[in-house]
Amino acid sequence: MFCPFCRHPDSRVVDSRTSDDGLSIRRRRQCPECGRRFSTTETASLSVIKRNGVVEPFSREKIVTGVRKACQGRPVTDTDLAVLAQRVEEAIRATGASQIEANDIGLSILPPLRELDEVAYLRFASVYQGFDSLDDFESAIAQLRVAHAATPDADAL
């Protein structure tokens, strides 16, 4: 790795530690030429294949932005959205794939969003899964009610 100060083509790793809840590695490096220290961050690249075939880098912020619309007017904080986006990214990275289709990201969002807020879940699912009629909503609500009945301390819908 080139030193950002003197452009020497080598550096020595002084310290390494995980950051971003284990999704990246932060390394402190020292240049053997000028002796100055600098930090680098390493992450495994993850790309998204969009519906039109375009490939772009994965962005947690896009998840937050998309889910925020479904959560408008709901008791969901920015911290809740950040945690949800992190959970989605962790689930995607756990697959071991370096590329993922946008559709699969949407499917990965649904379970943690359902746990976070069921109304936001219905809003997101209605757009994402293309609900066309009241029957689609009724079916989704019926599934939520069945899940509530199976959970002893669940709130009623």
UniProtKB/Swiss-Prot annotation:
A zinc finger (unnamed) spans 3-34. This is Transcriptional repressor NrdR. Its cofactor is Zn(2+). Belongs to the NrdR family. One of its GO terms (biological process) is negative regulation of DNA-templated transcription. Keywords: ATP-binding, DNA-binding, Metal-binding, Nucleotide-binding, Repressor, Transcription, Transcription regulation, Zinc, Zinc-finger. Negatively regulates transcription of bacterial ribonucleotide reductase nrd genes and operons by binding to NrdR-boxes. Binds 1 zinc ion. PROSITE patterns: ATP_CONE. Residues 46-136 form the ATP-cone domain. One of its GO terms (molecular function) is zinc ion binding. InterPro entries: ATP-cone_dom (IPR005144), NrdR-like_N (IPR055173), RNR_NrdR-like (IPR003796).
